[in-house]
Amino acid sequence: AYKLRPFTYIMNLKIRLTVMNFLEFAVWGAYLTSMGTFLFKAGYGSHIGFFYSIQGIVSLFMPGIMGIIADRWVQAQRLLSACHLFAAAFMIAAGLYGMTDGFSIGILFPLYSLSVAFYMPTLALSNSVAFNALNQAGMDTVKDFPPIRVFGTVGFIFTMWAVDFLGFQPTSQQFLLSGSLSVVLAVYSLTLPQVPVRSASSASGEKPTLVQALGLDAFRLFKRYDMAVFFIFSMLLGVSLQITNGFANPYITSFQSIPEY
């Protein structure tokens, strides 16, 4: 059983996890809804779909791989820091390269893809760090985590607006802002409560299979009608969301060139 912590410790912990969630999604909000405008203005409007689809592609395997590493070898808060550091390096490189005249999509896209590949696992890793810290403090994750997580949405909206107000939407400076925030979070993650590394064996003493380690056994839930319907409609919603993220901003900003508007 976990020991009950003093009120001041709990409040301090909540603030620390709130800052983590704010920064986690602020990194994403800096470019997710405005990157399409940058690509469109640069003459690469036909490639917008590739930039947004790569997020889903890397999400099929990178979170599972990083999850195995966090479970067996590297503490989650340290791996969270490392992932953000690599994501920042590639995102800043993409931002700087995008500022050059006549930049090639053949170079920008790999840099961006590598950054996204390291960023996507941090969504799950940050949750692991938060849940472990709350459990260690004897708190209820179902009750106490949602008010903390909502500040992730606040962070996303904050940087989304900041990019607009600073005039970064049609430029690659949005990548520089995202990368800079990743550096901040990489350093900050090292100050968060430690997450113990688990044994390589399961609770039953048996070594988990590769399918179990990657979480692929979760597909068994498709046998349940209600879960199958939920997953299918969630995927369809995700598709429409990415289309909106990629093309809504270029569509709206295109009216700037029409005198009537």
What residues fall within each predicted segment?
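Symmetry-related core transmembrane helices of the 12-TM Major Facilitator Superfamily/SLC fold
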Residues: Q174-T191
